[in-house]
Amino acid sequence: MTTIERRTFLAGAATAAAATVAGAAESAGRLRLGAPVSVPGDDPEALARAHREKGYRAAYCPNVRLDDAARLRDTVAAFARHDVVIAEVGRWVNLLDPDAEKRKKNLATVTEGLALAEATGARCCVDIAGSFSPTSWFGPHPENLSPRFFDAAVENARAIVDAVKPKRTTFCYEMMAWSLPDSPDACLRMVKAVDRKAFAVHLDPCNLVNSPTRYYAASELVRECYRKLGPLVASVHAKDLTWDVEMAVHFREVRIGTGSIDYGVLLAEHARHAPGAPLMLEHLPGDAEYDAAHAAVVAAGRKAGVTFD
């Protein structure tokens, strides 16, 4: 038995409650929305309750170690009591780092993240596929759209999934503007190539808007994403995008409701094709901005006939 398998076995008894929560809200016809939430101290009960008080029924994975069985048990139980699904375990490292030792370390980090997702009942563990850039762990590089990149990403995904052998969670690569997967079709090709049931899709439509053509056709891009990927989507990053007019093309992430993404379209497509996947707000500077984004999503959902609570 490998180290990851031993840890997962020890943690498994602590996490049975998570399975009963996973489909409860979806069966009631409601979507799950989440965002970063913090509370003083480290009480899982207080953190889970704070999510519900904010109107969220999905969460980013709390700070918990795979080898801390007691805290794992308390975290899973608290979030289950409050009907808050753990959407994702983020492991933001470069699986294609040019340095071999860093690559090895990063692969172990993501493998541990998938084991933690399995232990907590999170919908997925997510990372980007990586970058060949020597100066930025996520930055652009000519080879990031190459067959070599694709093959390396497939090999890494198989290695991570095969090490953990998850039964109730998935591993995903977040889509990117300048690295594979950079389109719905690229996601489908990667899912087919990895050929593992536990390899899924992490949807971030804003990350795919990398040209004026896609910016102007963003709603059709959103529809294409959900139409082609819907059943494979484990979690979704929800944000908005604007075009800062300069001498070169410059798209910028902004708070939902202040950009160009039609959330009426996005939420309707989400409800139709991927209702079980949590929608997670991200990349905002503080609580006030998250509260405003939350309100904008709920308002758009109301107009689209979609509810969250």
Where are these regions (language model features)?
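C-terminal segment of N-terminal export signals and the immediately downstream linker at the start
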Residues: 21-43, 50-54
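Acidic/histidine-rich catalytic cores of soluble enzymes
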Residues: 89, 158-255, 260, 308
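Conserved, mostly hydrophobic/aromatic
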Residues: 51, 59, 79, 106, ...
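N-terminal secretory signal peptides and thylakoid transit peptides that target proteins
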Residues: 1-16
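Active-site acidic/histidine proton-transfer and metal-coordination neighborhood
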Residues: 14, 19, 45, 81, ...
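Acidic-and-aromatic substrate-binding clefts and catalytic sites of carbohydrate-active enzymes
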Residues: 37-45, 61-72, 94-98, 133-135, ...
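Hydrophobic faces of well-ordered beta-strands that scaffold small-molecule active sites
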Residues: 31-37, 59-61, 86-91, 125-127, ...
